[in-house]
């Protein structure tokens, strides 16, 4: 199945999943694993849910694999990380297929696992799983809400609460989570995987929640997530800035979870594997609003999207999310500001006894105390994981996309935050990082995330990325460029510039410090492609361009045949154009924008005009003009209008 494959009809997508499974799926319990394997790991039950949905529609499929359901139950019973990812499928199986496609013995096993599960941190039992990141929160809250609703009079043995009490407990957490997302968007911004996990937590609620406003609000939050995909995708992929990123998604876009969802909803994307989220959207009959579908159409000209998500801890009280109120602590844990000076007192209360997070929080607490006693200054927002206020700039044309998190936490240690990406389509993605490891499974690592976050800014088709790495990081005093030459139709190097063309899209990259091409690394291909790595490795050219030095400037300028004429004309435009100065005081003579100035502590100016890079609206694009923390989002595209009124819990689609 190639990247050009497009699917919109729900049953058609489910049939496609089943056809893939006929080739890829295990047929015996011995072939199953505990890994994140779409068909054969603990999430393989989504393949069997797809079969149940088709059988319900009168379409023949291979037999249901009860052993795949058992694999999910094993993870739930052991309370392992990501067990919550399996529960949406189990709830739908019980609600829609019990007594027909789900036999009674299997249904009772599912019930017992769900009734004995640990649904939140305040319940007894060791914590072996992550409950508290933004996506895990909604998965746990929706699971507790719906399972409690299904079994109101049953006593759940783990903490002795009845199902009705669990439902009430979850409702308070759920309503807070919904309110935060409606007002501030998603801290894990534009994630290729976690957006789908958010939808996974919301999709059953939009059908089964016993409170009408929650059903509507969950549907509208799915709409909002889908709108983010609509205005930021390129050819059905999401090569943008990201709040959290993984190597396999940015290097190999066909692995993106979001691509199958866009294939299902937009007739865009890649449907060569199974997406749990897409299966659930198809099974629950989610219909994308007309205006969002129109906005998702490929741009015929230049489209610019500015948007803002999340808030800084220092601003939270202004927005009514007081860090001193323990009821708000999960907002800050969702954006991963566990150890901020304003949150740390309440963070200590989350795990009063030892947990893997306890060491980190207690260590920072002691640091604050010692510095205060000594009267010494101290960084009050130290979390390398933090996903605070982000101002996103994305430019899309028919031939390329360029996207940036404007001046995001410059100089701070990073985690999985991905400040910028350019793409000419498919695997022809371009970005830089300050690596934190030569391994590919660490966070951050060689390509996913940054040891030190840069100061990156974008204006239209030009991006400037400044790195200043602390001297203490002696092994990683460099930055490097991912530029897959084998994915380009042409690559030319001259006068310090690296030029690439794919189709009618062009890219130019310049490093202020001299660089060199590093030999391709077989370890990366083994990490990404498993059995087929050798074939991919043999086809690849060198892709890593390294610039040694703790302080460097990268300049990226995009173009196209429509904007610049021929590729030769695009390259000729850079003749004699200089990049002068350093990370503190930079002057770039852009062929398209004229003189651009910038620096580590200087504003961005273009043609002498200071460019705003902070304080964006919630949405600022041709389809939506929405102030930050507004109560509603109005989207107009293709003669259609969608209004997501969160304050009234009303959804309009005309």
Each PLM stretch: what is its role?
Residues 3, 8-139, 152, 161-174, ...:
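Ser/Thr/Asn(+Pro)-rich, low-complexity disordered segments
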Residues 88-92, 138-150, 196-208, 224:
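Contiguous, well-ordered alpha-helical segments that form the cores/surfaces of helical PPI scaffolds
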Residues 145-167, 251-262:
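N-terminal hydrophobic signal/anchor transmembrane helix of membrane proteins
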Residues 154-155, 197-198, 404:
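Short catalytic/ligand-binding loop motif for oxyanion handling, primarily in non-cytosolic enzymes
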Residues 156-159, 181, 237:
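Short, solvent-exposed loop/turn and secondary-structure capping segments
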Residues 166-232:
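Internal, well-ordered domain-core segments that constitute the primary functional module
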Residues 203, 212-286:
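Extended amphipathic alpha-helical segments with heptad-repeat/coiled-coil character used for oligomerization
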